Amino acid sequence: MYNKINISNVKEECCGCSNCQYICPVSAVKLTIRGGYFYPEVTECIECGLCKKICPVINNTSEKRNDVQESYISFISDVELRKKSTSGGIFYAVASNIIAKKGVVYGAIYGEKMKVRHFRADKIEQINYFRGSKYVQSDISKVLPLIIKDLNNGKIVLFSGTPCQVAAVKCLCKGKSNYENLITLEILCYGVPSPLIFNDHIQLIEKLYKSKVTSYTFRDEREGWSQYYIHSAKFSNGVDIYNNNLLQGLEQLYRSHYNVRESCFECKFIGSKRCGDITVGDCWGINEIAPDMNADHGISLVLINSNKGVEIWNELDSELEYRKVDLNTLKKFNGVLVSAPQKPDDYEEFWRYYKKNGYLKTLKCYSPYGGVYFKIMRKIRGIKRYIKRKC
């Protein structure tokens, strides 16, 4: 399938990890925006084949992934730490464990202009930068050389990211010095939203509220953890907005799977064979799985997928509340373990509309922010698709 010497024909299957750009010895690979996401563009290729060797899509086989060894529902025992976490605080516990061993942690943060990127932390207080879910594809390109450098220096490295990002880092570091020091924690993912759309979203609300956004929350828990996916934003002028149609419009674009990367619809990293040593995500269905466990401030499902994962989990025993749960039970209530998001029939139409009309008009047309207009436009598009099928 991938018979060309470089990664230019991976196309829609590309997950945007940037490994190819990093590894190219002649800088022939550039990442360019297409449809709201970064894709590789290859020029003046010298046919060395290095990009193919470290591409997580080309090198993805179930044999290279781990079977789930143990499955749990869990949360961190410290209530205050749990309240500050999006889910059960498991990432904080793992990251703290690594920092205590003089290791380093890589995870997603909000950078300059609210751009989501990966960051290197080697101090316990820096772990707070990673708090909060960020439903935007994070840029990992700047940390790839740092990860390799840390491994070469004998550091214990924890990398946290989506399954495709974890697969990318493992592909890149495989065979490098001290590879056994790399520990990976994958965050369960149901498709990565566009950084371009999020940038437009931030610019729009800054314009409307005449102030710079200082923080953005995709999972505001002021009304409890179960009230999930409520957005909020804080501005430098002190304004705090919460759960309005403008903010929730962005959520609707994601929920409708318009604002999801093309490769996510055929995700190669889903299922019981996992990329990471540990897998963490929200545990939905907790009232049916374990109604006696207190999930008021969040609870996580945790999959332990390797001997490294088992070792770390055992070290956290005194810090966590947990219960062993059969994997099939978790799958029953957490579809992200089983299937990828479904591609909308008008997915390409959405991106053409966005490219032509911009974010605000797209939001009005494709989300509740548009009110009655939204409903009418959706109905018209549905009629058009029906007529096309009949013709």
Where are the regions a protein language model picked out?
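Gly/Ser/Thr-rich loops at beta-strand to alpha-helix junctions
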Residues: 87-89, 112, 159-169, 191-193
